[in-house]
């Protein structure tokens, strides 16, 4: 298992329920894929450095997890098909 971090930005038009539902959805993908979540860090609503998809702000969330090498591909697929995701990145922690 490798250690990974993902940061994703959700659309600012979401209410608190919608935001929490999306975070739980992504956590579920990690856990159902055999991953172990180490930390969920909610940064909250922040201004973007530049406009993305016609929005200037979004809800930032960082998740640190351990998983097999195939899980990040599935998580990336779920991020891509979720309309409320403005931007995301998954990186392997080399520490």
Swiss-Prot record:
A molecular-function term among this protein's GO annotations: small ribosomal subunit rRNA binding
InterPro entries the record matches: Ribosomal_bS6, Ribosomal_bS6_sf, Ribosomal_S6_plastid/chlpt, Transl_elong_EF1B/ribsomal_bS6
Keyword Magnesium belongs to the record: no
Keyword field contains rRNA-binding: yes
Protein name, UniProt field: Small ribosomal subunit protein bS6
Any one biological process term the GO annotation gives: translation
Superkingdom in the source lineage: Bacteria
CDD domains: bS6 (cd00473)
Keywords: Ribonucleoprotein, Ribosomal protein, RNA-binding, rRNA-binding
GO cellular component, one term: ribosome
């Amino acid at each position: 298992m490798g250690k990974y971090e993902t940061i994703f930005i959700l659309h600012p038009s979401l209410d608190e329920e919608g935001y929490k539902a999306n975070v739980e959805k992504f956590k579920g993908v990690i856990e159902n894929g055999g991953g172990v979540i180490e930390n969920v860090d909610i940064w909250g609503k922040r201004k973007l450095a530049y406009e993305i998809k016609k929005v200037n702000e979004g809800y930032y969330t960082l998740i640190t997890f351990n998983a097999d090498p195939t899980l990040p591909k599935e998580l990336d697929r779920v991020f891509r098909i979720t309309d409320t995701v403005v931007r995301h990145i998954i990186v392997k922690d080399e520490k």
